[in-house]
Amino acid sequence: LIIKLKGSDREQVNACSDIISKALHRIRVTITHNEDVQAHEAAVANTLALWADSDEVDFIITSGGTGLGPDDVTPDATRSVIDREVPGLAEIMRLDGFKKHHSAILSRAVVGIRGRCMIFNLPGNPGAVEEYMELLLPIIPHAVDEVQSA
């Protein structure tokens, strides 16, 4: 799920989507949905809830809208639909990112669970998305298994 901010660079949006897709294919994940959503909290929340409540989605990765700007509503939308947060994953993403780029600490990204679906917020910067996907790839299968078996 790509969150499109006002004035988003189409190339950057496409690059983030491609990086996520390629990384997930490496761990043999089938992508069932891929959509751009405008940066409106209700639109993002509705899409997250719809996908998370479907039987065909085990986890959702968002890209974009995690910063401090007025259009950065992804964490707020995510918090409004999740049942529980998984703060350690968001914390490790910020910490890992901070080691390379101090501005990563400003991310408001959230990781949480709705029903039997995990939701991961990633930034909208292709370089950061690539770094965070490398960090998350070994964790996603185990985390999803834990949520699915609950």
Show where each model-derived region lies:
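Non-catalytic beta/alpha edge segments that cap or flank active sites
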Residues: 1-150
